[in-house]
Amino acid sequence: MPDTTQIPNSFDMIIAGGDVIDGTGGPRRRADVGIIADRVAAVGDLSQAQAKERVDATGLAVAPGFIDVHTHDDRMVLTQPAVAPKSSQGVTTVVTGNCGVSLAPFVPGSRAGEANPPGPMALLGTWDDYKYPTLADYNEALEASPPAINVASLVGHSTLRAGVMDGFERPATKAEIDAMARVLEQSLKGGAVGLSTGLAYPTAIHAPTDEIVELAACLKDFGALYTTHMRNEGPDLVPSVDETIEIADRSGAATVISHHKCVGRENWGKSHDSLAHIKAAQQRMKLDYDVYPYTATSTILLKDFLSTSEKTVLTSSATHPEMVGREFDSIVAEWGCSVDEAIDRLSPAGAVYFRMDEDEVRRIMAFPGAMIASDGLPIDEGRPHPRLWGTFPRVLGHYCRDHGVFSLEEAVHRMSGKPASVFGIKDRGEIRQGAFADLVVFDP
């Protein structure tokens, strides 16, 4: 790390003349940013300093690299080291292992006899991709083929369940919870930043609150987080928020609600109550949430999600790739079959569900401290939801510049300094002397 007691007069690179938005939420300022090796060595007037490379940023914004706190990039960071969907939009750090599914820790062969990973685990690939018995094994694979961006890993609750249970249609036994806790603690010692759940999915829907509390209780001593795709985001949105608050209360774990939203026309407006409950809970605990800037969701093809969707478009299908891009209703009509049969024939499959309200997205996004995240699905290679490639530019353009949901400084803070603080990502998320030089330069 550069010596912070003095300003050098020679740098590897100087980004000159830009409007520095430092990630703290404070006002922008015209300044140069000097870089030595992988760290910011100086911020200020460096017009007289020497540099091996000087980048003219006049008229541009210079910000910390964005941190995408909710991704499913577990496999992409290994197989596509450029990580183009993220690096192309200024993301320099991703948090993997969300919604209860992570590639590690999982002992290969634990689900012998099952052709495909169950439910949401298929979002990360096939059984061949679940080949990392420990988080250390996964990290070694990252080190062997380093991606262009940084990776912080959550441990998926459904992945833990898949490793110790013979089926998902019941609560875990005490012995199974103890086994999961041991694996979780091993992963936390190995650098995992927390535990995630996907309580709306078949792999975890039968997991009671007590099961989650027992596992989340492991987190506090490690300074790790509990993140959750809640049990319901429609008619039972508010009870699901209350369950999340109960888990945080009883476990003592700092908690993040993933992709907070209200789905289904009949449920629009419920964020008034959900946000009120969150605000009240924040007075006594560390509780945050993230949000993505679209009115459509995307995940595996599930009947329960179809019921709250105005329109559903297929994004992937292992068995019928020719149907990708088609509306689900048109596929059912063409095949002359039931909804259940169509799902069975298309699965494993993914879909985009149009089921949110624009005004509500803005309300949730505008809430103080809400973080920005993509929830993109790299496995949908043919017709992915645009959030995979476009989340951060859309927030900066559509919501910040065009609609004034918040200032540019606040937008950058919610994409950088705030998530770095919440997830304990040190020396990233801010432009200051001594911080890593993860930077993005863009036209505001």
Identify the function of each model-found stretch:
Residues 2-65, 80:
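Histidine-rich, glycine-flanked metal-binding segment
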Residues 18, 38, 59, 70, ...:
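Divalent metal-coordination and catalytic microenvironments
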Residues 61-85:
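Di-metal (Zn2+ and/or Mg2+/Mn2+) metal-binding site signature of metallo-dependent hydrolases
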Residues 22, 74-75, 101-105, 159-162, ...:
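Flexible loop/turn segments at secondary-structure boundaries
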Residues 79-193, 285:
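Divalent-metal coordination cores built from histidine and acidic residues
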Residues 249, 305-341, 345, 362-444:
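His/Asp/Glu-enriched, well-ordered alpha-helical/loop segment
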Residues 137-138, 143, 171-197, 203-348, ...:
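Histidine/acidic residue-rich metal-binding segments in metalloenzymes
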